[in-house]
A protein has these predicted regions:
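Structured C-terminal portions of repeat-based eukaryotic scaffold domains
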Residues: 236-240, 246-377
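Start-of-helix signal in alpha-solenoid helical-repeat scaffolds, especially tetratricopeptide repeats
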Residues: 84, 120-123, 127, 171-178, ...
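"A position-specific structural signal for the A-helix of alpha-solenoid helical repeats
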Residues: 82-85, 89, 128, 132, ...
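Inward-facing hydrophobic residues that define packing positions of alpha-helical scaffold repeats
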Residues: 53, 79, 95, 100, ...
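Flexible helix-coil transition and linker loops at the boundaries of alpha-helical arrays
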Residues: 113-126, 156-175, 203-208, 241-251, ...
Length: 377
């Protein structure tokens, strides 16, 4: 999203650099005062949380060694069977570990076999297989290929919806079509093309006019374009549609309203209000990585580096216990690593030790395509 992808990759580092320069000037003038944000705080020494998390990962992997042997046997069975459900399950497990090339290999040659009484399950498998094949290129540094493949999945679902026999089958393919459309919009956002994303989000809003998520995503697209007024209108629409759901609204939907409010405040440089909104969103169980990352951004701009550090460290440490398909795994990103490196320079008594603890943890949990050049040496 706008703030998570842009602010964390450059703004935190630039703010920290300014603070570092200011400290150097203070020390050069003979004051040598340590700023309050430079002290180790009750949350724990910088890097300590990640050192603990690394130990937990090693212990878990030691227990999982036998399971890996079972996985290898499953892979052989999948290759022989070629059934979509088995291949999809195997690929998802590999993707959760960041083993994307192996996940792609698990899907190669997989096909859907038709059972006489199992057409609905076969349709689900067809869609899941196609969607995963469209997802994988993005993780293998082929963003354009992933976008094109997801567009093809959308076209397939639209065709099946038109040709389906029976209202139930037609509705099922429409749901899959809309899921593919959300995937296309998301890839346009990731590719810094919010205008193209809005075309798809507009179509989704017409197809599902009571779904708040489409208006929320449109608001973030407007933020990417610097259109605060457009974002405000979209976020207000999402909030009203969430309220209209009444008790049927989930905690996740209510949390998204608060996250949207935080994004709006952050982009408008209203940092205390942004922090309050993000904190409320996370209290509601908001799991989107952007909420925690953007809360860390707001904390930096609000002059609270220790809170920013604690948020980023906890986001990384949460990966240890995250489910295989959890959004929490997206927290492992070069921008988070770079920003923690910058923050450690000002908040750690021993920046080198804190960075080593983080690097050790990242090496244990990062996917195979992770850009290791972001790691401090």
């Amino acid at each position: 999203m706008y703030c998570a992808r842009r602010a964390t990759s450059s703004s935190i580092a630039s703010v920290v650099a300014s603070l570092r320069d200011a400290r150097a000037r203070r020390e050069g003038s003979g004051g040598r005062r340590r700023a309050a944000m430079d002290d180790d705080v009750a949350r724990g020494a910088p890097g300590a949380a990640l050192a603990d998390a690394a130990r937990a990962v090693r212990a878990r992997r030691a227990r999982r060694d036998d399971d890996d042997d079972d996985d290898d046997a499953t892979a052989t069975t999948t290759a022989r069977d070629g059934r979509a459900r088995d291949a999809v399950a195997r690929a998802r497990a590999l993707m959760a570990r960041g083993r994307y090339a192996e996940a792609k290999a698990a899907l190669d040659g997989a096909a859907v076999g038709r059972d006489d009484d199992d057409d609905d399950d076969d349709d689900d498998a067809t869609f899941a297989l196609a969607a995963l094949r469209a997802e994988l290129p993005y993780h293998l540094n082929d963003a354009r290929g992933s976008l094109d493949a997801m567009c093809a999945v959308h076209a397939m679902c639209a065709r099946e919806a038109r040709e389906a026999r029976g209202a139930e089958a037609r509705e099922a393919w429409r749901r899959r079509r809309d899921a593919a459309a959300r995937g296309v919009a998301r890839r346009h956002m990731l590719g810094d093309d919010p205008r193209a994303a809005l075309v798809w989000l507009d179509a989704l809003a017409r197809s599902e006019p009571d779904e708040p998520a489409h208006f929320s995503a449109a608001g973030r697209a407007h933020l990417m374009m610097g259109d605060l007024e457009g974002a405000r209108l979209c976020f207000e629409a999402a909030e009203k549609k969430t309220a209209a759901l009444g008790e049927a609204a989930t905690e996740a939907q209510r949390g998204r309203v608060l996250r949207d409010r935080g994004d709006y405040f952050l982009t408008g440089l209203r940092f205390p209000e942004a922090r309050t909104a993000f904190a409320a969103a996370m209290a509601k169980g908001e799991t989107d990585v952007a909420a925690k990352v953007n809360s860390a951004v707001a904390a930096v701009y609000d002059g609270d580096l220790n809170s920013s550090r604690a948020l980023l460290e906890s986001g990384l440490a949460n990966v240890v216990n995250a489910d295989v398909n959890s959004k929490a795994r997206a927290f492992i990103s070069p921008s988070v690593v770079k920003n923690l490196n910058s923050i450690y320079e000002l908040t750690a008594r021993s920046p080198a030790e804190a960075k080593r603890a983080m690097n050790d943890f990242i090496k244990l949990v990062a996917p195979e395509d992770f850009d290791v050049t972001c790691m401090a040496t």
